[in-house]
Amino acid sequence: MKPPSAQSSPAAVAAAAPAMDSAAAADLTDVLCEFDAVLADFASPFHERHFHYEEHLERMKRRSSASVSDSSGFSDSESADSVYRDSFTFSDEKLNSPTNSSPALLPSAVTPRKAKLGDTKELEDFIADLDRTLASM
């Protein structure tokens, strides 16, 4: 990456993008100038920085974790992971289940999902292990 002082001037940016209208070129110039300022700020010693990135990062983390309110004792990352896992499962269930707004399917067209052969064996093994554990208590 080029150091901030070697970055292109706003006029060079505007000339390099002839297909953009002037508003888009101005927006791009503003974003690039802001990016250059942030890079220059990161290049400066910590005590001379103009912006407080750590405070901003912590505030954004608090704001994003506030949307995942969970009083179960899990950490934010654990609860966020479970939310994503649940949302994927929920999405899959919603996709595979008929809704009131979907057209009614004929009973012959609906085929239930068959259980896998290993499903019952695993469950039986778990129950047997649980019975042995309880018997030893």
From Swiss-Prot:
The UniProt entry, under InterPro entries, shows: RGCC (IPR029252)
Q: Which UniProt keywords apply?
A: Cell cycle, Cytoplasm, Cytoskeleton, Nucleus, Phosphoprotein
Q: Name one GO molecular function term.
A: R-SMAD binding
Q: Which superkingdom heads the taxonomic lineage of this protein's source? A: Eukaryota
> What is one term from the GO cellular component aspect held by the record?
nucleus
List all Low complexity biased stretches: 65-82
Q: Which parts of the sequence carry Phosphoserine?
A: S67, S69, S71, S75, S91, S97
Q: What does this protein do?
A: Modulates the activity of cell cycle-specific kinases. Enhances CDK1 activity. May contribute to the regulation of the cell cycle. May inhibit growth of glioma cells by promoting arrest of mitotic progression at the G2/M transition. Fibrogenic factor contributing to the pathogenesis of renal fibrosis through fibroblast activation.
Q: How does it assemble?
A: Interacts with CDK1 and PLK1. Interacts with SMAD3.
Question: Protein name, please?
Answer: Regulator of cell cycle RGCC
Q: Please name the source species.
A: Mus musculus (Mouse)
Chain's gene name? Rgcc
